[in-house]
């Protein structure tokens, strides 16, 4: 972590200028496979520390726009909400007499995410086209697996912030 701090201090002005000019290019994410409880494998895309910092800046920009639009019953990847909160809400519903629930998983959702559809949806609420282009660059930045970089024409790596 100390090394990245030194890197950012030394290159801060150049990085900020590249971001402002729209010339910032994220690095490909590093592919990591982790086992799933059902025996399958989940492929994660781990961004560089530098890109994580930039993704956090994008997240801070998007959260105030999108957070008010989400359902009160949505808990995943939400600020101030946890799996423990979701379990507590299920308990509350059970105590109120509810006996049915729905578990939903969209298979391969992150692997097949259509970039253009996502970007067009984002444009409905994000007026700054630079933010849209930054997100597009992340989506298209590629995945490095076993030292080989593969292009990403669809999908979004799980593991980053965006």
Name each model-derived stretch.
Residues 18-23, 27-32, 37, 72-73, ...:
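Conserved polymerase palm-domain catalytic core
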Residues 1-2, 35-44, 71-73:
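Glycine-/proline-rich flexible loop or hinge segments
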Residues 3-25:
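Amphipathic alpha-helical blocks
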Residues 12, 16, 29-31, 41-43:
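A common structural microfeature
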Residues 41-70, 154-162:
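Conserved pre-motif C helix in the palm subdomain of viral-like polymerases
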